[in-house]
């Protein structure tokens, strides 16, 4: 079943070339989709248009049968409860504890007063504890977020998205600032979330080999337009060159391509 559909979506910033130009694609429930491309290719703009953190300049976006691009404030807030977001730079409140940051994922379901006072019921707290345990950071729940590592912060961000009970999670360069070991941990967790929970993931990445290893599907962007959309097995060296505008093929890419091909 189609969960997300974009039709002719564009985004123009004043005084610049279009960040997105006539972008159209659909995503099925349970898909793991990686969006690759060079810096400035439109990956982050795409993700932020999907949940309307920024407003598209044109086109239509529908999610779960609802036309997101036409929603007003209350309707958009409701839809956003089902679209989690994981940020490159975590977007946590550093002075608050891990568990407090995770429970912020429930704010979309709360009244303004309950949100300000931090009122959460026992079911919400139990769910947060269970997710932290799955992500291997339950022992950090009472630590302030300025006292934990970058990889641990990213797991907090994932936990915050999961307590929303989302149908889809958007991940904006979630491993860009992490070392290889931490990157693998994060990607493994994201893959398990997709396969075990059936949550759709759309993740922007620079690393071609990571996209090849983890994705059901890859979408390649260059200057705001789609230059590739298909399974990892079809992503050829020529396509990589087309997407990035320069030779990007390495031994790790060739090894990953062989793995993706089975």
Q: What annotation goes with each model-predicted range?
A:
Residues 36-38:
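The feature captures the beta-strand-to-loop junction immediately N-terminal to the Walker
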Residues 51:
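Helix-to-loop junction immediately C-terminal to a conserved catalytic motif
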Residues 67, 110, 114-139:
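Conserved ABC ATPase "signature" region
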Residues 144-148, 152:
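Conserved ABC ATPase signature
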Residues 165:
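Conserved catalytic motifs of ABC-family nucleotide-binding domains
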Residues 169-172:
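Catalytic Walker B motif of ABC-type/P-loop ATPase nucleotide-binding domains
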Residues 180-182:
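Helix N-cap at the start of a conserved alpha-helix in ABC-type nucleotide-binding domains
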